């Protein structure tokens, strides 16, 4: 939906925004790693020369949306999963504190946090330094990089908070209206941030 918004003819930005869908995340971030390996050296190269076209723009930052809708809390003592969204549900914004671009990534994370406070209608955001095991990782040493998700990837998803992670249950019918609204708030957070970062504006009719 964000791609649809930014591709509208009445939306103008001073910087390019590229939306990418990665495959094979489960088997080792293969799609994202291949993109970095194959495209990193092509940044900012005009092709064909004199055309004014740059098939691979210079990378300024990477904002990843991972699993975005299930925040029901930790498993119960018997191992069962809470049916309903937890009252403390929030949008997690993670950067990797051990990356070569950690300072710029942290700045980007807090910029998104500010966007959440301004534009998200229902759910707050939390910033954390442990981005891991996600398609933004291949970019983390190159450019400011963050990952938005429903739970902290390491301590919460890794502890079984999301029963739909890499499972066949990750389908539309699994999620409630509240779950979808959490995902919407992540989209609102990123939409607002991108609009400012790319100096976006609406063209007057």
PLM segments and residue spans:
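Amphipathic alpha-helical segments that form well-ordered structural scaffolds
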Residues: 1, 5, 107-115, 138, ...
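Alpha-helical metal-binding/catalytic segments enriched in His/Glu/Asp
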Residues: 1-30, 190
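A generic secondary-structure signal for well-formed alpha-helical elements
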Residues: 6, 10, 39, 43, ...
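Surface-exposed helix-capping loop/turn segments at secondary-structure junctions
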Residues: 8-13, 118-123, 196-205
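Extracellular/periplasmic catalytic domains that process cell-envelope and extracellular macromolecules
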Residues: 11-15, 28, 54-57, 138-142
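Hydrophobic/aromatic beta-strand patches that form the interior of the parallel beta-sheet core
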Residues: 20, 61-63, 144-148
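Metal-dependent peptidase/peptidase-like ectodomains
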Residues: 22-135
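Active-site-adjacent mobile loop/cap segments within catalytic or ligand-binding domains
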Residues: 73-89, 94, 126-205
């Amino acid at each position: 939906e964000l791609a649809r918004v930014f591709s509208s003819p009445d939306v103008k930005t001073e910087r390019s925004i590229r939306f990418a869908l990665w495959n094979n995340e489960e088997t080792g971030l293969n799609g994202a790693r291949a993109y970095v390996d194959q495209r990193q050296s092509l940044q900012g190269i005009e092709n064909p020369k004199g055309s004014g076209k740059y098939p691979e723009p210079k990378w300024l930052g990477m904002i990843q949306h991972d699993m975005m809708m299930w925040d029901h809390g930790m498993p119960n003592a018997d191992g069962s999963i809470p049916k309903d969204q937890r009252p403390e549900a929030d949008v997690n914004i993670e950067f990797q504190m051990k990356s070569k671009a950690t300072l710029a990534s942290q700045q980007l994370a807090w910029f998104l946090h500010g966007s959440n406070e301004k534009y998200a209608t229902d759910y707050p955001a939390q910033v954390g330094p442990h981005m891991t095991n996600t398609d933004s990782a291949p970019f983390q040493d190159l450019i400011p990089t963050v990952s938005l998700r429903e739970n902290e990837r390491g301590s919460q998803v890794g502890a079984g908070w999301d029963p739909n992670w890499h499972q066949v249950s990750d389908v539309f019918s699994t999620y409630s209206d509240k779950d979808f609204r959490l995902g919407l708030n992540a989209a609102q957070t990123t939409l607002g941030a991108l609009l400012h970062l790319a100096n976006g504006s609406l063209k007057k009719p």
